[in-house]
C-alpha cells in the first residue's frame, strides 16, 4: 500500500472541501447583505454560465491521465499552446452566449429579465478557466505545496473580494468579485506553474 498516495489524497480532498464551501459563500453573503430578491437574481443569472464549469470538469478528466504520465519538461513544451487553443474555444462560446443571453432570458426566465446583464457579465469570468491546465498539472504531478498556496490564495481572495465589493455595489459587487477572483486564481496558477522545479 502506498501511504504517500493516501496522504496526498487526503490533502487534496481537504482542499476540495474548502473550495466547495468558498464557492457557495457568495450566495450566503448576498443573502446576508442584500436579501432574498437579489440572491434570486444572482442565482438565476449564474445558472446558465455555470454550465461551462461542466465543460471544465470534462476537460480535466480527459487531460489528467496525460498530465500524470508526462514529465514536467514535456508538459511545459505544449501547455501554453494548448491553453491558448482552449481559451479561443471558450471565448467563442462566451461571445455567443453574451449575444444570445437577452433572447434566452425572454424565453426561459421572462420574469427575471433584470438578471440577463448580470448573467452576461458573469460569463466573462469563465474566460479564465482554460488556465485549469496549470493547476491540474500541479495536481497530477503531486505538487502539494504549490496546491496549498494556490487554493489558500484563491479562496482567501474570493472571500475578501466579496466582503469588499458586496456592500457598496450589491449584486454587481458579487459579479466583480467572481471575475476578479477568477483572474487572480489564473494568474497565481501560471506563476506557480512557472516556478515548478523538475
Put a short name on every predicted segment.
Residues 1-23, 62, 66-77, 196-198:
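Interhelical loop/hinge segments that connect adjacent transmembrane helices in multipass membrane
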Residues 6, 74-88, 96-100, 119:
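Interfacial transmembrane-helix starts/ends
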Residues 19, 42-61, 93, 122-132:
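Transmembrane helix-bundle signature of multi-pass secondary active exporters and lipid flippases
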Residues 49-74, 137-140:
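Helix-loop junctions and terminal segments of transmembrane helices
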Residues 124-153:
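Membrane-interface junctions at transmembrane-helix termini in multi-pass inner-membrane proteins
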Residues 99-127, 172:
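Interfacial segments at transmembrane-helix termini and the short loops linking adjacent helices
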Residues 37-39, 98-102, 116, 145, ...:
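Membrane-interface helix-loop junctions in multi-pass transport and translocation proteins
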Residues 4-8, 12, 29-50, 113-116, ...:
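Interfacial/gating helices of multi-pass transporter permease domains
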Amino acid at each position: 500500500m502506498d501511504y504517500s498516495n493516501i496522504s496526498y489524497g487526503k490533502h487534496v480532498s481537504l482542499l476540495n472541501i474548502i473550495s466547495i464551501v468558498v464557492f457557495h459563500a457568495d450566495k450566503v453573503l448576498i443573502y446576508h447583505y442584500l436579501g432574498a430578491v437579489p440572491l434570486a437574481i444572482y442565482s438565476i443569472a449564474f445558472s446558465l454560465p455555470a454550465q461551462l464549469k461542466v465543460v471544465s470538469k470534462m476537460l480535466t478528466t480527459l487531460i489528467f491521465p496525460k498530465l500524470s504520465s508526462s514529465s514536467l519538461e514535456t508538459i511545459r513544451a505544449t501547455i501554453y499552446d494548448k491553453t491558448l487553443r482552449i481559451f479561443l474555444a471558450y471565448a467563442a462560446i462566451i461571445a455567443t452566449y453574451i449575444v444570445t443571453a437577452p433572447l434566452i432570458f425572454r424565453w426561459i426566465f421572462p420574469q427575471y429579465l433584470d438578471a440577463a446583464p448580470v448573467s452576461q457579465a458573469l460569463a466573462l469570468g469563465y474566460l479564465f478557466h482554460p488556465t485549469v491546465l496549470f493547476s491540474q498539472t500541479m495536481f497530477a504531478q503531486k505538487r502539494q505545496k504549490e496546491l496549498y498556496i494556490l487554493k489558500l490564495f484563491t479562496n482567501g481572495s474570493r472571500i475578501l473580494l466579496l466582503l469588499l465589493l458586496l456592500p457598496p455595489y450589491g449584486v454587481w459587487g458579487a459579479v466583480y468579485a467572481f471575475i476578479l477572483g477568477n483572474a487572480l486564481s489564473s494568474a497565481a496558477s501560471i506563476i506557480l506553474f512557472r516556478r515548478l522545479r523538475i
